[in-house]
């Protein structure tokens, strides 16, 4: 039922658009309304009337001719979708040709129904208006027509031939994105990112790269980036037994490790000098110096 109403609303909007482009005279509208009223009052005689008109070559062609003109590309049809009528009862009216615009398009008459199934009556509706089928697929009306904006019915997307597609199953057809569609798309994208991350993938398909720093080289962990300055360093050892302080002073090569205790190390790089200025003038390098009180320790 919703698809039928959507189709009727679409056809009604096309009729209104055609009327805005080429208004029809009041005489033609009156004659067409009288003809449709006669057919709707006697639905059982519609087929017989059509056969008589086809044999005699006369009938309702005059109002349709004055309204829209040529039907050479395809004869107009009466489409009654309400009050028990169906597309099987659709009949073709013979209309003389005039001002043919396209050989592959036809002229159709449409009823307009409200949501309760009642036919909408009045000159401003599309009950008695004949419009050319095969109009452009753009269903947007010009100059701010509010009917298309306030309609709750999804009329579908136009196909390549210019007709609205309304029968594609039970799934609704939308002309644009809904908020739920955007949320679903974002959620799916996040889920895909998490899935790839859990597998240890570096996101090659999504254009994202996860840069991880390389692990440190164990062979270079204990070495310094800058070379060690060659030479000697001065070391002092203090030992206090409660009454006296034992002090030792000496020099060790810069390349040797610093350790606890009075240790005179050797050069490991082979480039440190054997003695330095302090070593050369220090008389207590190999002699232990005794100090009885802490204030006696020289600066």
Curated annotation (Swiss-Prot):
MF (Gene Ontology): metal ion binding
Family annotation (Pfam families): Paramyxo_P_V_N (PF13825), zf-Paramyx-P (PF13008)
Biased composition (Acidic residues): 144-160
Residue segments, region Disordered: 40-91, 133-163
GO biological process, one term: symbiont-mediated suppression of host type I interferon-mediated signaling pathway
Keyword line: Host cytoplasm, Host-virus interaction, Inhibition of host innate immune response by virus, Inhibition of host interferon signaling pathway by virus, Inhibition of host IRF7 by virus, Inhibition of host MDA5 by virus, Inhibition of host RLR pathway by virus, Inhibition of host STAT2 by virus, Interferon antiviral system evasion, Metal-binding, Viral immunoevasion, Zinc
Binding site for Zn(2+) 1: 232, 251, 276, 279
Residues involved in Zn(2+) 2 binding: 255, 267, 269, 272
A GO term from the CC aspect: host cell cytoplasm
Classification via InterPro entries: Paramyx_V_Zn-bd, Paramyxo_P/V_N
Sites marked Interaction with host STAT2: 240, 246, 248, 250
Family the entry assigns: Belongs to the paramyxoviruses V protein family.
Subunit structure comment from the entry: Interacts with host IFIH1/MDA5 and DHX58/LGP2; these interactions are involved in the inhibition of the host type I interferon signaling pathway. Interacts with host TYK2; this interaction inhibits the type I interferon signaling pathway without affecting the type II pathway. Interacts with host IRF7; this interaction inhibits IRF7 translocation to the nucleus. Interacts with host CHUK. Interacts with host RELA/p65; this interaction inhibits the nuclear translocation of NF-KappaB.
Entry function: Plays an essential role in the inhibition of host immune response. Prevents the establishment of cellular antiviral state by blocking interferon-alpha/beta (IFN-alpha/beta) production and signaling pathway. Interacts with host IFIH1/MDA5 and DHX58/LGP2 to inhibit the transduction pathway involved in the activation of IFN-beta promoter, thus protecting the virus against cell antiviral state. Blocks the type I interferon signaling pathway by interacting with host TYK2 and thereby inhibiting downstream STAT1 and STAT2 phosphorylation.
Domain observations: The N-terminus interacts with host JAK1 and STAT1. The C-terminus interacts with host STAT2. The C-terminus also interacts with host PP1.
Protein name according to UniProt: Non-structural protein V
Organism the protein comes from: Measles virus (strain Yamagata-1)
Name of the gene this protein is made from: P/V
């Amino acid at each position: 039922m919703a698809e039928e109403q959507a189709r009727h609303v679409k056809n009604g909007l096309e009729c209104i658009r055609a009327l805005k482009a080429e208004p029809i005279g009041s005489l033609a509208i009156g004659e067409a309304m009288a003809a449709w009223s006669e057919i709707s009052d006697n639905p059982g005689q519609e087929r017989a009337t059509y056969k008589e008109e086809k044999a005699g070559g006369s009938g309702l062609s005059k109002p349709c001719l004055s309204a829209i003109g040529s039907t050479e590309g395809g004869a107009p049809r009466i489409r009654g979708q309400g009050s028990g009528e169906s597309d099987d009862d659709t009949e073709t009216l013979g209309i003389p040709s005039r001002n043919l615009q396209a050989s592959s398009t036809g002229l159709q008459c449409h009823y307009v129904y409200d949501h309760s199934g009642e036919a909408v009556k009045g000159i401003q509706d599309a009950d008695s208006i004949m419009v050319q089928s095969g109009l452009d697929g753009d269903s947007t009306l010009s100059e701010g027509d509010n009917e298309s904006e306030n309609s709750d019915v999804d009329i579908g997307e136009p196909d390549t031939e210019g007709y609205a597609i309304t029968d594609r199953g039970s799934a609704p057809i939308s002309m644009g994105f809904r908020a739920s569609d955007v949320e679903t798309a974002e959620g799916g994208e996040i889920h895909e990112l998490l899935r790839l991350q859990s597998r240890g993938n570096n996101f090659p398909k999504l254009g994202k790269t996860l840069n991880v720093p390389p692990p440190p080289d164990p062979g270079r962990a204990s070495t310094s980036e800058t070379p060690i300055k060659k030479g000697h360093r001065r070391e002092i050892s203090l030992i206090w037994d409660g009454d006296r302080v034992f002090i030792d002073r000496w020099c060790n090569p810069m390349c040797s490790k610093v350790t606890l205790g009075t240790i005179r190390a050797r050069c490991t790089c082979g480039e440190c000098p054997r003695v330095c200025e302090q070593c050369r003038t220090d008389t207590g390098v190999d002699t232990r110096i005794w100090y009885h009180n802490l204030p006696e320790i020289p600066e």
